[in-house]
Design a protein with these regions (language model features):
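Non-catalytic cap/lid and distal C-terminal segments of serine-dependent acyl enzymes
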Residues: 1-285
């Protein structure tokens, strides 16, 4: 548990699911008159400590904001249970037919199922944010959403469909591949809003350099061919680079996009680098 962290457990009235918030409030500086900037971090059970330590270290520089960090997670100390619980919250609906094809057919079925992302956004807006704002003064013009993998996918969905809920978005190794890249169905409408000057936001999309490099790991319940198929289907690096290039081409003065490939990192190694870069991107002034 990170220093100065508070824990808030609640059961959602939106979807009747149990959540745990990990909240770290900065203490080294006076509270800004407008309230604190805040980072809402998906998968709080997994990455909260990294995010807090990174934010506090970077805030040693006077030109870096020291934010409140909120990890959104589940009331469990088990990594496996947290990974299972996240599957419904961080995915959109997917057909049973599609679940029988490709990489996802080789994955263990979560006990929660899939397809609860829309309700998850409501949980954040209607239940997470009010609890945090009751605890500490928040600057509603300095809200960041950050997530890795399916959390990165969720962050992209928020960028495209819930843009006004946050001002900055950090998608680390987003699972764009999910459900035949269904998230990209919302890209065209978002791009039109950007061109029309209706979007004011900043976004960082990053990925590990090795995520599209085939690597077989013996000892896991997957064959060498399974790993090869997964690498080819997921297209982690090309998906991020192609999306980043398209968004950068929009060239709007109110929308800033940065794409980063983290050298030497694979999917499970990239969160520390992605979070560190995300804190710098969103908090440096």
């Amino acid at each position: 548990m990170a220093l100065n962290a508070r824990v808030i457990d609640f059961t959602s009235k939106v979807n009747d699911r149990a959540y745990r918030l990990f909240v770290s409030i900065p203490t080294r500086r006076p509270v800004p008159p407008e309230g604190h900037a805040v980072v809402y971090l998906i998968d709080g059970n997994l990455h909260f400590g990294i995010a807090v330590d990174t934010a506090r270290i970077q805030a040693c520089w006077p030109d870096v904001i020291d934010p409140v960090v909120v990890g959104i997670g589940y009331p469990t100390d088990s990594v496996n249970q947290a990974l299972d619980q996240r599957m419904i919250d961080l995915t959109t609906p997917i057909s049973e037919e599609r679940l029988k094809k490709g990489f996802i057919a080789k994955m263990p079925r979560p006990t929660t199922g899939y397809g609860g992302m829309d309700e998850y956004f409501r949980v954040i807006e209607e239940e997470v944010k009010p609890r945090v704002e009751a605890l500490v003064a928040i600057n509603k013009l300095e809200q960041v959403l950050m997530g890795h993998s399916l959390g990165g996918l969720t962050t992209l969905h928020a960028l495209f469909r819930h843009t006004a809920s946050f001002q900055q978005f950090v998608a680390i190794a987003p699972s764009i591949w999910y459900n035949d890249r269904a998230v990209l169905a919302h890209e065209a409408a978002f791009s039109e809003r950007v061109r029309a000057g209706q979007v004011k936001a900043r976004a960082l999309i990053s990925v590990g350099e090795l995520e599209s490099t085939f690597r077989f790991v013996p000892g896991l319940p997957a064959s060498e061919q399974d790993f090869r198929d997964m690498t080819e289907e997921c297209r982690m690096v090309p998906n991020v680079q192609e999306l980043g290039a398209r968004l950068a081409a929009l060239a709007s003065p109110q929308f800033e996009i940065e794409t980063v490939v983290h050298a030497g990192d694979d999917h499970n190694m990239v969160p520390p680098a992605g979070i560190a870069r995300g804190i710098r991107f969103t908090m440096r002034r």
